[in-house]
């Protein structure tokens, strides 16, 4: 099966590439080229981007910052990534709009659900920045929320690994990859795919998740076409 409307979740770490911090312009351009091909084929695409390559709220709070304050700083980091991604996409010929959950009128549109859907219908990519606008919620939860709001067929979680494993494959070469899982299995086994709030939202709204390696060129296209890559999580597995 192929998908007509997709929510792509990009972690901030994915934008780092092999760098220890910040944004790798080559990675941004590679992602932009893949997105361009998908959009040209008629798929509607929205993106939620994280901010962990610049600042992570949980780390800030563990270092003594007030948790809500740290989360707001993390939200600003996601906006920086969103604007950078917009620049890369538009240089690749993809008409793009950034919408933020916290109003920043000089640099982005405020998040308005109906406007976001209208942009998608016109063939524009919509990049959501600022998380969901509230502290204590991750960008994974934002992905599940926005996917439900825009009636996305699926969430693509683009990561540094080629799927979901029972252990970290970088530390444990013998780690076993899951081809498919149910939401209930992810919750009961506490498998680290997304936080439990995000998984529960996807479960309740019947939005499948496909986890795959973003650094493999063409993987976004393959996932949109319904090819079997990475790991799939759904109500039925």
UniProtKB/Swiss-Prot annotation:
InterPro entries xref list: AceGlu_kinase-like_sf (IPR036393), Asp/Glu/Uridylate_kinase (IPR001048), Uridylate_kinase (IPR011817), Uridylate_kinase_bac (IPR015963)
Residues given in the record as ATP binding sites: 9-12, 52, 56, 159, 165, 168
Classification via Gene3D superfamilies: Acetylglutamate kinase-like (3.40.1160.10)
GO biological process entries: 'de novo' CTP biosynthetic process; UDP biosynthetic process
PANTHER family: URIDYLATE KINASE, URIDYLATE KINASE PUMPKIN, CHLOROPLASTIC
Similarity annotation: Belongs to the UMP kinase family.
Protein name per its UniProtKB record: Uridylate kinase
Organism of derivation: Prochlorococcus marinus (strain SARG / CCMP1375 / SS120)
Gene that this polypeptide is encoded by: pyrH
């Amino acid at each position: 099966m192929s998908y007509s409307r997709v929510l792509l979740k990009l972690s901030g770490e994915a934008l780092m590439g092999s760098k220890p911090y910040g944004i790798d312009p080559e990675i941004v351009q590679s992602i932009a080229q893949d997105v361009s091909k998908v959009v040209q084929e008629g798929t509607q695409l929205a993106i939620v981007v994280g901010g962990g390559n610049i600042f992570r709220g949980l780390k800030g709070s563990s270092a003594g910052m007030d948790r809500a304050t740290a989360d707001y700083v993390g939200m600003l980091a996601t906006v920086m990534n969103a604007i950078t991604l917009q620049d890369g996409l538009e240089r690749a010929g993809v008409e793009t709009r950034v919408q933020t959950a916290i109003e920043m009128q000089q640099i982005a549109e405020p998040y308005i659900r109906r406007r976001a859907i209208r942009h998608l219908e016109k063939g524009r990519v919509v990049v959501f920045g600022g998380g969901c606008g509230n502290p204590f919620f991750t960008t994974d939860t934002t992905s599940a929320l926005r996917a439900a709001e825009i009636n996305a067929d699926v969430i693509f979680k683009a990561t540094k690994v080629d799927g979901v494993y029972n252990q970290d494959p970088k530390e444990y070469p013998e780690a076993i990859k899951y081809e498919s899982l149910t939401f209930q299995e992810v919750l009961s086994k506490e498998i680290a795919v997304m936080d439990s709030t995000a998984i529960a939202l996807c479960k309740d709204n019947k939005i499948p998740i496909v986890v795959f390696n973003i650094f493999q060129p063409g993987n976004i296209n393959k996932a949109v076409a319904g090819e079997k890559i990475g790991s799939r999580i759904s109500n039925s597995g």
